[in-house]
């Protein structure tokens, strides 16, 4: 096959999600000089094509679909394919090991321990910096447990270690994957949304730099700027803050994942003279209702729990993919 004829560039094999066994292959064929039949003369003419052909092949040998794209669109497509390949499960056994992880996690993570496990996710992934793509979800939290901001997380990691030992007996998984799935299960255990998590993250062999997590004392403007550096919008900041609905921060039932966090924020109980209510939430929680842009989303989520669940799910998936290094087969 010469360079003037259609040639195979690369074949990609994808698994649609971590629960599906459906696969498809795409062959990217370079532009070729194509012999066409001219309707006017009924003669064959040679025309140099500027388009690329994408042939999608199913497991059925007799089934395929061909799409045609311009060179410019092909550049965009190839870039998108490369990006998506990092967002899809890289391990061929992901569909088999994922339910095992869920099962073992649920054996050790009770509703009372869910908040600590979810906090583990934020403290591992929250070190991500968009400008240099440093930090992020990489299991480095295991080396950072003595830091002041991570006090109390050693217990949560020990809880997950019990589940990880069982999972590793079947198939070794990274701490980054284990923490990501555990956070999702913690939300679900407490009545929150079911959040799908793809597998294939690699662990870091060293701790992330210090001082990358947002301090609890930040103002609203400081929070927005901090989350912006990590690639998150104000809406995503407010949605992710809803994780404080479980735990001991004082936002309703500590074992129920719902939108009580936002309803209580609007009541501003910390302004009361009562010693108990004055301790509700962190300064960073209080800051959300002192900023017009944040307040708009606080009100929206207080009124619509389904919207909160939807936006939290999307933001969580983004969080546990932030800065991830993926296992390339």
Curated annotation (Swiss-Prot):
Keyword entries, A-Z: Heme, Hydrogen peroxide, Iron, Metal-binding, Oxidoreductase, Peroxidase
Statement: the UniProt record of this protein carries the keyword Amino-acid biosynthesis: no
Reactions the enzyme catalyzes: L-ascorbate + H2O2 = L-dehydroascorbate + 2 H2O
Single GO biological process annotation from the record: hydrogen peroxide catabolic process
GO MF: heme binding; L-ascorbate peroxidase activity; metal ion binding; peroxidase activity
Binding site residues for heme b: 244
Cofactor, how bound (note): Binds 1 heme b (iron(II)-protoporphyrin IX) group per subunit.
Membership in a protein family: Belongs to the peroxidase family. Ascorbate peroxidase subfamily.
Protein name per UniProt: Putative L-ascorbate peroxidase 6
Protein's gene: APX6
